[in-house]
Amino acid sequence: MINSKYFFKGFKSIKGINSPALALGASFIAIGALLKNIGFNLEQSIFSTFLTYALPGSLVMAESFIVGASLINIFLAVWLVNARLYPMTVSLMPLLLHKSQPRWKYYLSCHFIAVSAWLIMKSNYQSIEKKHRIDFWIGIGTGTWSIAIIATVIGFLAADYLNKDMMIGLAIVNPVYFGCMMVGAMKSLQISLSIILGAILGPAFFFISPEWSILYGGVLAGTIAYFVGELK
């Protein structure tokens, strides 16, 4: 079973000063309004966030729906966008693994992988006994997931009062927050180098391939930072 003490400790961590709760909520208010505007009802909007729970994936799903893409194409588009979460999963799960914990917890908790929850866990895992980290992580994930769902409902109900510019402003709050958090995480050579090179190479590749510039810049920046760190 899930240890309630560590679960609620993780759940309450979303109230911290560095919590992404406000930024995450603002972005999903925009998602809720967008889903209503493209024809979703309230139940469908909630179910969408319940399953997708990632801002880029939700945006891609909505955009694909608008242009009339088939269900399989929407599924593939969201799957490809959310593939970016795989490296985060690979880097996080070894920190949570403990032989006393059942495997179903780890399979369940993979759904909570998102930049918001991942940043909270990476900042706090050392203060939690390894045996209980998975319960702490499930608490974090449940908290951020709940915020996303509640914000989607608020956005859906407030859609008539939000114009296009307001929705864009709300949607961009979360990426800005993550950018600030990444700068704050520059505590090692590898992390600092990857962020700085990414900020330089991303725009540089835009002139070569606008569609793939972020991917190319990120892969190259991360690879260089990794090998520089290994050489050190």
Which stretches of residues belong to each language-model region?
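Helix-loop-helix junctions within the multi-pass membrane cores of secondary transporters/permeases
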Residues: 6, 76-164
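Membrane-interface helix caps of multi-pass small-molecule transporters
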Residues: 50, 63, 91, 95, ...
